[in-house]
Amino acid sequence: MGKGAASEKYQPAATSENAKNSKKSKSKTTDLDELKKEVSLDDHKLNLDELHQKYGTDLTQGLTPARAKEILARDGPNALTPPPTTPEWIKFCRQLFGGFSILLWTGAILCFLAYGIQVATVDNPANDNLYLGVVLSTVVIITGCFSYYQEAKSSKIMDSFKNMVPQQALVIRDGEKSSINAEQVVVGDLVEVKGGDRIPADLRIISACSCKVDNSSLTGESEPQSRSPEYSSENPLETKNIAFFSTNCVEGTARGIVINIGDHTVMGRIATLASGLEVGQTPIAAEIEHFIHIITGVAVFLGVSFFILSLILGYTWLEAVIFLIGIIVANVPEGLLATVTVCLTLTAKRMARKNCLVKNLEAVETLGSTSTICSDKTGTLTQNRMTVAHMWFDNQIHEADTTENQSGISFDKTSLSWNALSRIAALCNRAVFQAGQDSVPILKRSVAGDASESALLKCIELCCGSVSQMRDRNPKIVEIPFNSTNKYQLSIHENDKADSRYLLVMKGAPERILDRCSTILLNGEDKPLNEEMKEAFQNAYLELGGLGERVLGFCHLKLSTSKFPEGYPFDVEEPNFPITDLCFVGLMSMIDPPRAAVPDAVGKCRSAGIKVIMVTGDHPITAKAIAKGVGIISEGNETVEDIAARLNIPVNQVNPRDAKACVVHGTDLKDLSHENLDDILHYHTEIVFARTSPQQKLIIVEGCQRQGAIVAVTGDGVNDSPALKKADIGVAMGIAGSDVSKQAADMILLDDNFASIVTGVEEGRLIFDNLKKSIAYTLTSNIPEITPFLVFIIANVPLPLGTVTILCIDLGTDMVPAISLAYERAESDIMKRQPRNPKTDKLVNERLISMAYGQIGMIQALGGFFSYFVILAENGFLPIDLIGIREKWDELWTQDLEDSYGQQWTYEQRKIVEYTCHTSFFVSIVIVQWADLIICKTRRNSIFQQGMKNKILIFGLFEETALAAFLSYTPGTDIALRMYPLKPSWWFCAFPYSLIIFLYDEARRFILRRNPGGWVEQETYY
């Protein structure tokens, strides 16, 4: 082979200039579609000569420095391209001018406009509109800052990918090893890695020694995978001769050729995909947009109607414009933006106490709308620790205890065969407990060693006592470690029993172990391994394998003292001791068991109408076993394979629609069209996707979204980040999750437990219900705030309610009660109903507007006007004489206006009475809002069923009353807010109306419960 002068024909797999140029011309969409496809590599199929031909690399000397420099200049550095980021000021502006804020800004601008018109046309303009504009602007700015602060902690996806990129790499150039910056690594470089290194690029392994890599961040498989030059699988993600960029080498050494760098590596593709995906609008954002349309529609309709009416009534153009602006602004619920934000924040805090950390406030409600959950298996549905589940000895399967607190089944530990089996499992085992953990429960202890050996170690420690003492009594003499060729691990120990000097113990793949045995241990005695026993072994092996468990076989041999005296020189290179004709002792099988709370959580999801789909990189048999264990595939539901086995017919003769459950293999998924995938998602209620790749997880999420589902996705690996980002709500794991997955997600489960998602769904549904109640409560007071202005225009009476007083209601008395509804407990079991349909079940619908504006609001307005007319009548102005009095009433120079009894009133005296009316109207609204708050507690139940257990709400009732009294009676508020003290009797004017509201709504809900689905429900149930 020529020395490193790379062949001119060489075109790297995915980094050629052609690819670069064509990429520029393609649209972003095409690029993302390309990234969603499976990784296509053929380097794992090439032999060493073909690799040399393709990359022009001398397989011993590496590239020449000059050639490496050329390739670096052509392909660029080995780094991930950061995506275009949104500047912080734009994010801030989105919070400040997006969604509900735009309505308040419009109101503020209209207020300033109205004030400007008044300044230009009137000598002494009132400052009300100026105050209102300033207050509205302040509310939006404060709420915007609050929301920005809440979400500023989010979405730095690429930063966490950067942490995964190794800093240094050991390359061989011109036959010399040198450590260079990983960014300088080029395609065709010869790279060496050892245990503890991070892989600097995608490598095709050309030589290896006991090399194992941890691919969990990429594939989700927790077991270290061995790496060697052999081509072992068609799938490049599963073959043994490719090591992937940013995964870790955990033991051994390897040498490989760089086949892809930077963005073109498998990890780079995932990073680009995750950061490039467009994220849709959250359901609550869509609801708020819909709400704004409704409120704006109502405001503009009323404004324009009364603008035309005021022109007909003879007002000037400028007056009509002021009225138009006033009506539109009066329709804006100033306090609602703050209320919604605070309600979502309170729920987010409540969820954090239940181990759900919400990064994005809107995600709180999205989780409640979820109709499909695509859940990862390892660590989410399962405990993420391999545990011994079954043993087979004495021709019998024994069940081990897999519970987290060891409260499960026990088996006979006195058997001589168990004694022998446990001794082999303890001695033929390299796993050890890490130091200083004596006080930690055995199952929680950290172990140095792979997952299977850790499971065996913990099992034996629990059942038989100290493993280290057992090892001390039987010191290891020699060992043959496990390798992929012979598939067993063997060690020879000094024997503490008197029957022989040395004991040979072996474990490995069951069929390989059985082949090396001629006898079997039954009830402590060696018996010949006949066909009957082989069949019994085969049945046990198939049964345990069918449960999705990883099965290991164990055997031993007592080496006779005559042949193997003390000090015998055992040789593991050329074995000078028997490795056949051994005695088979038994099987032990391991599984990552389901978490205790998961089956119940899956059951809750099912009764809540939520479809739970398992998406895992694990083997289909294991995935199906866990799915059955946790109830994702419920008892009695069969897959096509189950039906075929039951009817004893080929699988292809079974109609897929007959099977409710379905296990889809990743390789089959690769060949499915969108339509076929949609069919699977539509016709099967219980689905498991096994052996899936990151791209496929994303395709599954998109498929569910095409069905109209609101999709939640759980994941912990880097491989999950595109799906987490694309889902309506991405849920990452707080303990086992990679930084990348946490950054891509909207919510983090602090305890990695699927059951916490169900708690989150419950909270999300509750906050949607409670937001409805909060909005209904807040909007109702809009009518008694708008109608005084309308009567002022139509009937030409003194203004019954001032702008400043409206602000005191919206941003004062109504705030705490509206927020208190966020603490209201659920009316019924909200986890027994179907997920809401975002198209039909809106946060604010016509029925809510009809109830708030057309019914309860009107009764409230009557209460306000009653107190207004009572005060004016007590001061001498009867209602009939008020019509048409406005112009004279507001004239500064009219100092002798006569009332109904002929008394004369100066301008200042009139205004004191008017402002007292404002205060009384304000107090009346507070009193009728008591009843409104109580009826908003429940949408269907009677208030007597629901009870008054919400302490915050009771505090809200007292708080709004105390605030109203404070504003009315505190000296100085007459000057600052134009609020005047009221006679005690005037407080009672609105009481009858408050009672009417309460009785009216109790009667409505009674009819609603008596006639479900009837006319009253169709017209009034919001």
Swiss-Prot record:
Protein name: Sodium/potassium-transporting ATPase subunit alpha
Gene3D superfamilies the record matches: Calcium-transporting ATPase, cytoplasmic domain N, Calcium-transporting ATPase, cytoplasmic transduction domain A, Calcium-transporting ATPase, transmembrane domain, HAD superfamily/HAD-like
PROSITE patterns listed in its UniProt record: ATPASE_E1_E2
Reactions listed under catalytic activity: K(+)(out) + Na(+)(in) + ATP + H2O = K(+)(in) + Na(+)(out) + ADP + phosphate + H(+)
Active site: D376 (4-aspartylphosphate intermediate)
Modified residues (Phosphoserine): S16, S942
Lumenal side: 109-131, 309-320, 792-801, 866-917, 970-984
Parts of the chain on the Cytoplasmic side: 6-87, 153-288, 339-771, 823-842, 938-950, 1006-1022
Example of a GO MF term: metal ion binding
Region of interest (Interaction with phosphoinositide-3 kinase), ranges: 82-84
Function of the molecule: This is the catalytic component of the active enzyme, which catalyzes the hydrolysis of ATP coupled with the exchange of sodium and potassium ions across the plasma membrane. This action creates the electrochemical gradient of sodium and potassium ions, providing the energy for active transport of various nutrients.
One GO process term, biological-process aspect: intracellular sodium ion homeostasis
NCBIfam families: ATPase-IIC_X-K, ATPase_P-type
Pfam families registered for this protein in UniProt: Cation_ATPase (PF13246), Cation_ATPase_C (PF00689), Cation_ATPase_N (PF00690), E1-E2_ATPase (PF00122), Hydrolase (PF00702)
Transmembrane segments: 88-108, 132-152, 289-308, 321-338, 772-791, 802-822, 843-865, 918-937, 951-969, 985-1005
Annotated keywords: ATP-binding, Cell membrane, Ion transport, Magnesium, Membrane, Metal-binding, Nucleotide-binding, Phosphoprotein, Potassium, Potassium transport, Sodium, Sodium transport, Sodium/potassium transport, Translocase, Transmembrane, Transmembrane helix, Transport
Positions contributing to Mg(2+) binding: D716, D720
EC number, as in UniProt: 7.2.2.13
Chain residue ranges for the region called Disordered: 1-34, 215-235
